[in-house]
C-alpha cells in the first residue's frame, strides 16, 4: 500500500444514535480458524508519527468478565469468543517447540476476530458466518466478525480481491447478514474500504459508500443485537475532519455503533483513543470506538507498516477498557499472521508470533 496504514446531524439522527447505543452491546472475540476458512487477513499501511509511549499490556486472562460502567459502552459485559486459528493449529502441531509456551500464553489464550475474506463465496458465506455466531451463542460469548469482500479491496495491493462487482457485493452482504443469528455480535466493517477510498474514481467511490451503507443496514436489520463499527484507519492517516463526512455518506449515523481504529497497525493505544475521540466529535458525538491493540504494545517502527521487526502485542482484548468513549480493545488483526512482506499475507509465522509475544 502506498497510503498510510495496513488491512462512518440532524437532531433525529443524533437521537437515533443514542437509542442504538442504549440497547446495550456485546464484546468481541475472534475465530482465527475462521480466518483460515474465510481467507486472508489484511495488510496495513502506515505513515507517519514517531512512536509514543504505549500503556503496558494488561495481564493475559483467558476470559473477560465484569460490569461495564453505565453509559460508557455500547457492548454488553460478556466474555469474548475465542475461536480456533492459525496459532492454535501451530501449537497443536508443535508442542515441543521452545517457543510454544510463550506463544500459547500471550497469543493463543486471547480472543481474536474472525475474518471473512478470500474468494467471493455467495454459496457458503451464510453457513460460514452461522458456524461462528452459533458457536459463540452456545458458549454465551460475544464474537467479533470482519466482512472483507468489498470490490477493489486494498486498491489491488497485498490483500486485493473482493466481490467481482457492487451488485455481487450487495448479494453477498445479504447472505453474510443472514448468518449473524439473533445474539450479540460485533461487526467490524470492511477494513480499509473508507481509508483507501481515494484510489477509486467518482462513480466507484459513490458505489462503495452505498455498498457499505447497504451492508451495515443488512446487518442491523438481520440482527438488531449486532453492533457495526466502521474502519477509520489510524491516527497518522486521515484527519478527523476529513474522514468524518465520508463516514456519514457511508451510513454511520443510521447504522453504526461507532468506529474502529488501528486495524492491522501499530499505533499506540494512547494515540488511537485520542484520535477516536476526535473523529467521534466531528460526527457529533454519541458513538463509541474499538481499538485494535493486537500489535501496538511498543508502538510503530517509524512509518513501516509491513511486518516491522521488534513489535509487541498490546492491551489484551476486553469490552471493559476503562477509557471513556472506547467500547473495547480488540485483537482484530491476528498476531503472528503476516502482512505480506515476510511471507504470504495472512499466513501464520511462529517466528513473528514469538517476537510479538516478547520472545
UniProtKB/Swiss-Prot annotation:
EC numbers: 3.2.1.4
GO molecular-function terms, A-Z: cellulase activity
The entry's keywords: Carbohydrate metabolism, Cellulose degradation, Disulfide bond, Glycosidase, Hydrolase, Polysaccharide degradation, Signal
Residue numbers annotated as active site: 154, 192, 339
Enzyme class: hydrolase
Cystine crosslinks: 155-199
UniProt pH dependence: Optimum pH is 8.5.
InterPro entries, alphabetized: Beta_cellobiohydrolase (IPR016288), Beta_cellobiohydrolase_sf (IPR036434), Glyco_hydro_6_CS (IPR001524)
Domain of life: Bacteria
Swiss-Prot/TrEMBL catalytic activity: Endohydrolysis of (1->4)-beta-D-glucosidic linkages in cellulose, lichenin and cereal beta-D-glucans
Compositional bias segments (type: Low complexity): 60-72
Listed Basic residues bias regions: 13-24
Region (Disordered): 1-26, 47-72
An annotated GO BP: cellulose catabolic process
Family (UniProt): Belongs to the glycosyl hydrolase 6 (cellulase B) family.
Function (record text): CMCase I preferentially hydrolyzes carboxymethyl cellulose (CMC).
Name under which the protein is recorded: Endoglucanase 1
Protein's organism: Streptomyces sp. (strain KSM-9)
Lineage: Bacteria, Bacillati, Actinomycetota, Actinomycetes, Kitasatosporales
Gene: casA
